[in-house]
A protein has these predicted regions:
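A residue-level marker of the well-folded mature domains of exported/periplasmic proteins
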Residues: 1-196
Length: 196
């Protein structure tokens, strides 16, 4: 039997020091303490090359499991292969592979003996709720900015955002949102100079 103190869990995270990331780290640190396991973090900034390298780094560091917040589905191809090759368990948090838009990657995850799943929110419902909060506060010129092409989480939020805008515009014919929500599409593909 393996002693819990010999178990090391790797965490590939965008940042362990920003507002959300630091809270995630606090929770994971407490869970690791309660279970008596080790935890090791790699901050990857949602840069694709760093995301895939973080999985390789954590596997090489002897982690038996890795939880990852990737920035796009395509990164999961490499992450799954690295974990399969090294017999390291892999799960996602705040992300999910899109069965519809990334069918081959989704299938690779299903076929993997080491990919164990994902924990994520109901992103379409989140997107709709977020746009409704803004609309109810009086905002009409609302844009949604995505981080990385192929991010299934952002695409789910965008789906909910559009649904919320469409419902609002149908229910409020004299009080539409600017550009009927199209501004968000433009911004997500072409952020303003100096934005990032």
């Amino acid at each position: 039997a393996v002693d819990n103190s010999d178990i090391k869990i790797g965490v590939s995270i965008w940042s362990s020091t920003d507002v959300l990331g630091s809270q995630c780290k606090l929770i994971l640190d407490e869970a690791a303490k309660a279970l008596g396991v080790q935890v090791q973090y790699v901050d990857q900034g949602h840069v694709s090359e760093k995301v895939t390298a973080s999985v390789e780094q954590l596997a090489a560091a002897g982690c038996q499991g890795i939880i990852i917040c990737n920035s796009s589905d395509t990164e999961m191809t490499s992450a799954i292969k690295t974990c399969d090759d090294n017999k390291v368990y892999l799960s996602q948090f705040f992300r999910i592979i899109s069965e519809e838009n990334s069918a081959d990657i989704y299938q690779a995850a299903k076929d993997s003996a080491y990919y164990i799943g994902a924990v994520h929110e109901d992103e379409p419902a989140n997107g709709e709720e977020l746009v409704n909060i803004l609309l109810n506060k009086g905002d009409r010129n609302i844009g949604l900015i995505g981080w990385e092409q192929g991010d299934a989480t952002w695409l789910g939020r965008w789906e909910g955002y559009k649904a919320g805008v469409e419902k609002w515009n149908a229910d409020h014919p004299d009080d539409h949102t600017a550009d009927d929500g199209l501004e968000g599409t433009r911004l997500s593909r072409d952020p303003p100079p100096g934005f990032l």
